[in-house]
UniProtKB/Swiss-Prot annotation:
Organism taxonomic ancestry: Bacteria, Bacillati, Bacillota, Bacilli, Bacillales
Name of the coding gene: hisD
Source organism: Listeria innocua serovar 6a (strain ATCC BAA-680 / CLIP 11262)
One term under GO cellular component: cytosol
Protein's recorded name: Histidinol dehydrogenase
Binding of substrate, residues: S232, Q254, H257, H323, D356, E410, H415
Example GO biological process: L-histidine biosynthetic process
GO MF annotation terms: histidinol dehydrogenase activity; NAD binding; zinc ion binding
Any Pfam family matching the protein: Histidinol_dh
Catalysed reactions listed for this entry: L-histidinol + 2 NAD(+) + H2O = L-histidine + 2 NADH + 3 H(+)
Family in the record: Belongs to the histidinol dehydrogenase family.
EC number: 1.1.1.23
Amino acid sequence: MKTLTGTTEAILNELRAENSSNSSDQIASEVKAIIENVKNTGDQALFDYTAKFDGVELNELRIPNSDIQIATNKVDPAFLEALKEAKANIESFHNKQKQSAFLDSEKDGVIRGQIIRPLETVGVYVPGGTAAYPSSVLMNVLPAKIAGVKRIVMITPPSENGINPHVLAAANLAGVDEIYQVGGAHGIAALAYGTASIPKVDKIVGPGNVYVATAKREVFGLVDIDMIAGPSEIVVLADETAKPAFIAADLLSQAEHDTLARAILITTSEKIAQQTKIELNKQLENLPRKAIAKEATESHGKIIITKSTAEMFHIMNEIAPEHLEVQLENPMNYLYQIKNAGSIFLGNYASEPLGDYFAGPNHVLPTSGTAKFFSPLGVEDFTKRSAFISYTKEALAKEKDAIVLLASKEGLDAHAKAIQIRFEEEN
């Protein structure tokens, strides 16, 4: 890991220079062609792309409910029990996010209000590749269920051995309505446009590789999306009370995701910086995903030594990390200084994987600095708000002159006339 010192601006400039997009014109061009093909040829394009990219010849896209139940019965009962405990925690947290409708009748003859409606159909993308992510199933599906979404469709790319049974078990437990064995940009296109087999959805959520992210960007507007996810990130803030072994383990927990993952320690202590680097190299040797984590920490890992706690928080807020750990003495005292972070972990025993799997808050988080203006996935992301208005003639009469004046100042005479006509004698 590279150590950074110096002025705050110099440190931030180096971090900004590295934080470039993972997409490219070439990838965007390929994705557009894939989307157009799926739009024009539907299921056949999905069969062709699955054979090409996944090496699997499919006879059907939808996974039968009987296969899902067989997979659920096959997994280790202890895994299923852990999944149920995680589900309970996630539901408990997200139930508290539910928004309320309201009715306002403070003025005579005026009724105003807000109604909350769930989206009708949501598509959930679950990655395949080098790791299985049953936790992503729970985190994407359960908030949608709590919001009241009636139809939840999941897609995930197949392998030669089919779909990972742990992913299918998680989908079964979470209450997914339909599962299709298709992934990549072609899977996103199918959800956005619909095919003979796969229904068009209102919103697409879930992480994926750069092709999936680019496809989500392309179809946004036709459907809603959650966010464009970049590589995993973690920033750990530490003082001399922190434990280097804990810091190193938590940095590696993100570095093992992806060679592009960013693992950053910001500390006021040179001693902690040095001990963490030693501990990280020691722990790295025993990781099954050592090659991935090693490349991530060598290419994108940073240890930043600051002169003060205030500088530490300033740099962190500029990074706006996906995951933030505060391993400082009395960490709750610093909560108000955190402006930009996806998910916050306070204290030596609030390790980041606690949020990935079990505590309850969502692990679908803004990355690449977007925590400055985006929030974690939640129940509200699967709902929409509508306002309603009702006026009596008497109530409108009290306000008509002000409305007509505002409309006339904007040069919108038909707006003004729509109010005035209601008070002409024949009406």
